[in-house]
């Protein structure tokens, strides 16, 4: 007998029905979409079996072409065929035009100085072009998976700034697609290899794509990735290999002053030759001119290696710098993950293996590894995994910091930091003999405490009574996967510590967060001026406090005239510090410093005399 499932209208009869979500690698050269199906993560092919979609958009009088169709026409219509649009994301037109590379496109500036491509379909910006690349990927996913997507995870380079990240989100919004998370490409690659569930240690992600190079050093600790350091070059990638080979071929064929159409044709052939040299020691290049003449030349792997050697060495130099920034050595790196189609180039793999001293991970297609990691993360974020498997639940919506002298805010954890996260910073005492320190934890983007949201207060007691600035207190902010903030303050020499816990997001609506962010931008200039004033006032108070203590102890080293002169300059500084002119306060501090140079020298001489009193030459 068949059993019927009964459910309320509009509701699923299966309470744990699989939710549809995908990961999208929105790449400079190619883009991919991947999904988890029946526990297996894989990229989704189009109807022709092609997994990667060329990140190329062509605008014609009749409509818009995307992907391979656009790529086929790019040589004949370079002006209206936009490639590597990711390089334009978040950049101003001035920035683009001041670069070394010339583009065939006709540009105009938007009201805010951003680039607009002039096309037969009208003016379009990089966000709109990116949306056209996302469109067929979303359509492919919904057709393959058999339903509407409930969200996507889109990957971005680790170095992308807020404007570039927001532009990527906006591109998805134009399609009405919900972005579950923007995931850094190196983290996605590590997740794809399952490194989040393996041994703890340091992992390097070497990502050489079409237009960018990114090296990230991650530390894996209990399934959580901590980014130790990132580096790279936002204008170095496989495209540059193509351009070098293109220039070489053009020189061999003695082609001068070629038009944009032939230049694009030559570039396409250079890319084909580069890819063929991955498995061959030599490849024949050919080019058909407008008059039907066919040019041919043999390109060897040795020639190609020689052309790109300097660029590959440049990536290794970035690796060296980034390891130094991370405070680790190449020997400490457990695994090196290769990401990006350009890592297929044999010379790249050879140089990376030589530098890190071990063969890099290449078992997952380097073109697909980021999309696969994004799909795994999308599957988690949409709710298809038990909560125990959730690693990256959220990001910190507003910066977390601590109040310092003068009512200033020292930000410890910046907004948009992925959680869980831990950050530490050192502070010191303000007064001689200070044995306790009060901590005020705040949230917000403003420079002064009064303009931020108060979260918690606590006190650290038992600090050794040392001179001002001698005690070192390490303050650690930890935000766990549930968004719970723990702040711990520890005096380093004694180990004495105090801590408090708070939920930073509690009671804050999206509207309130947005308002706080808008206020920080609106008052940015005013806030910086107020901060500079407060900093000078704090410095003036510190100088006066220190000098008063010195005078109380060694004032008898001065003549009455010297003492009166110093007292007068101190009074002048105290008066100016009550005003609102930061430059005047700074100048008054410098004047006081000049007037106390002799006093400082006398104190030093006296200290030496006291230290050596009663000592013989032999004992010194």
UniProtKB/Swiss-Prot annotation:
- For this chain's UniProt record, which GO biological process terms are given? iron-sulfur cluster assembly
Gene3D superfamilies registered for this protein in UniProt: 1.20.1270.10, 3.30.420.40, Actin, Chain A, domain 4, Substrate Binding Domain Of DNAk, Chain A, domain 1
On the tree of life, the source organism's domain of life is Bacteria
Give the PROSITE patterns listed for this entry: HSP70_1 (PS00297), HSP70_2 (PS00329)
Q: Which UniProt keywords apply?
A: ATP-binding, Chaperone, Nucleotide-binding
Q: What does this protein do?
A: Chaperone involved in the maturation of iron-sulfur cluster-containing proteins. Has a low intrinsic ATPase activity which is markedly stimulated by HscB.
Protein name as catalogued: Chaperone protein HscA homolog
**What gene is this protein a product of?**
hscA
């Amino acid at each position: 007998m068949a059993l019927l499932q009964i459910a309320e209208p509009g509701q699923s009869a299966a309470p744990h029905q699989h939710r549809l979500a995908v990961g999208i690698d929105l790449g400079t050269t190619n883009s991919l979409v991947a999904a988890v199906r029946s526990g297996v993560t894989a990229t989704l092919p189009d109807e022709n079996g092609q997994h990667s979609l060329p990140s190329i958009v062509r605008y014609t009088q009749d409509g818009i072409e995307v992907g391979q169709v656009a790529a086929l026409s790019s040589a004949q219509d370079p002006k209206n065929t936009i490639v590597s649009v990711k390089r334009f994301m978040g950049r101003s037109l001035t920035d683009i035009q001041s670069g070394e590379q010339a583009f065939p496109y006709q540009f105009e500036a938007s009201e805010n100085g951003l680039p607009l491509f002039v096309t037969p379909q009208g003016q379009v910006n990089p966000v709109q072009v990116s949306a056209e690349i996302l469109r067929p990927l979303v359509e492919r996913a919904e057709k393959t998976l058999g339903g509407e997507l409930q969200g996507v995870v889109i990957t971005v380079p680790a170095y992308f700034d807020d404007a570039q990240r927001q532009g990527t989100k906006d591109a998805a919004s134009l399609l009405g697609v919900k972005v579950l998370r923007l995931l850094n490409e190196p983290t996605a690659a590590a997740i794809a290899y399952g490194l989040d569930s393996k041994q703890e240690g340091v992992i390097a992600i070497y990502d050489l794509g079409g237009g960018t190079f990114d090296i990230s050093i991650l530390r894996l600790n209990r399934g959580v990735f901590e980014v130790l350091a990132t580096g790279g070059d936002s204008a170095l990638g496989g495209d540059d290999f193509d351009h070098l080979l293109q220039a070489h071929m053009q020189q061999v064929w003695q082609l001068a002053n070629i038009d944009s159409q032939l230049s694009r044709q030559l570039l396409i052939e250079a890319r084909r030759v580069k890819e063929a040299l991955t498995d061959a020691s030599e490849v024949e290049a050919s080019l058909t001119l407008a008059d039907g003449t066919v040019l041919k030349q043999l390109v060897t792997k040795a020639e190609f290696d020689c052309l790109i050697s300097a660029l590959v060495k440049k990536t290794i130099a970035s690796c060296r710098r980034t390891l130094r920034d991370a405070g680790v050595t190449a020997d400490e790196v457990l695994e090196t993950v290769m990401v990006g189609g350009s890592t297929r180039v044999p010379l790249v793999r050879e140089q990376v293996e030589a530098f890190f001293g071990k063969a890099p991970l290449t078992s997952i297609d380097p073109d697909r590894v980021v999309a696969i990691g994004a799909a795994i993360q999308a599957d988690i974020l949409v709710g298809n995994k038990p909560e125990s498997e959730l690693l990256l639940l959220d990001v910190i919506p507003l910066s977390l910091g601590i109040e310092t002298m003068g009512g200033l805010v020292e930000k410890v954890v910046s907004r948009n930091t992925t959680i869980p996260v831990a950050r530490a910073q050192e502070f010191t005492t303000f007064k001689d003999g200070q044995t306790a320190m009060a901590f005020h934890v705040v949230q917000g983007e403003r420079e002064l405490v009064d303009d931020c949201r108060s979260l918690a207060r606590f006190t650290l007691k038992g600090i050794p009574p040392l001179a001002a600035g001698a005690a070192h207190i390490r303050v650690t902010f930890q935000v766990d996967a549930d968004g719970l903030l723990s702040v711990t303050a520890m005096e380093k020499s004694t180990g004495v510590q105090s801590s408090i816990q708070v939920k930073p997001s509690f009671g804050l609506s999206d509207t309130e967060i947005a308002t706080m962010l808008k206020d920080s931008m609106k008052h940015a200039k005013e806030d910086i001026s107020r901060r500079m004033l407060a900093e000078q006032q704090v410095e003036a108070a510190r100088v006066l406090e220190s000098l008063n203590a010195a005078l109380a102890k060694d004032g008898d080293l001065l003549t009455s005239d010297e003492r009166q002169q110093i007292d007068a300059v101190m009074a002048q500084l105290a008066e100016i510090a009550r005003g609102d002119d930061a430059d005047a306060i700074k100048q008054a501090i410098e004047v006081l410093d000049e007037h106390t140079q002799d006093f400082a020298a006398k104190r030093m001489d006296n200290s030496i005399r006291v230290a050596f009193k009663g000592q013989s030459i032999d004992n010194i």
